[in-house]
Amino acid sequence: DGGAIDVTDNNSDITHPSGFTIINNTAFTNNTAEGYGGAIYTNSVTAPYLIDISIDDSYSQNGGVLIDENNSAAGYGDGPSTAAGGFMYLGLSEVTFDIADGKTLVIGNTENDGVVDSIAGTGVITKTGSGDLVLNADNNDFTGEMQIENGEVTLGRSNSLMNVGDTHCQDDPQDCYGLTIGSLDQYQNQAELNVVSTQHTFVHALTGFQNGTLNIDAGGNVTVNQGSFAGTIEGAGQLTIAQNGSYVLAGAQSMALTGDIVVD
């Protein structure tokens, strides 16, 4: 597992400390794995591993844009698998994407099949730093938690993050949540989910705090089943409340959307 990096604890010793790995200003291209994690595989049987994938202020190549592409994993099958995590598979691990202001990390290419450069697993992903993270692969087999605490995350491929939060929701249906934009603790930051002219459905709760923004470009659509938004929803795209769904728009700017709001 792990075509480029394997951060794994196969030790059953419960006293084994959690690991911490920093991956800074590093591009991953053309990596393959017969198992899981085409570029990166991380899992632990004890405490979660902590992985920091960062682009700092010093990165100047390609105008400050770092691109990870053409990574794939087969999951011990006959061909590439989204469930295996073409770019990364994270089990009991917490991964932070820390992108500096004015820098961009692009994972995947929309011209490739979505299985290439996919992210899968049940861990936790946190976006920090005021820079941009662009996800262009099919990440529907990522069922862990995702939090955008600072900066922008752009979804470049339709229906590519549908099942975020599913693992937690299966374990605790009474406390079910999916993707979170903004936070109470990091209220001084500005966090944004940017949906270009693509179509996205979130099965579990999409939650926005006061410092969170959901931008939906013209031609784009976001379908929500549950959750609430206390921040800003903007853009010329469409927000759809799914049939039998329930969504609370609580922010003063939550109706800044110039496109349609549709209730199925």
Give names to the regions the model predicted.
Residues G3, F20-T21:
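Extracellular beta-propeller repeat domains
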Residues T104-G108:
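Bilayer-penetrating membrane-interaction modules that drive fusion, pore formation, and translocation
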Residues S12-P17, A27-G38, T42, A47-Y89, ...:
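Surface-exposed loop/turn positions within long extracellular repeat scaffolds
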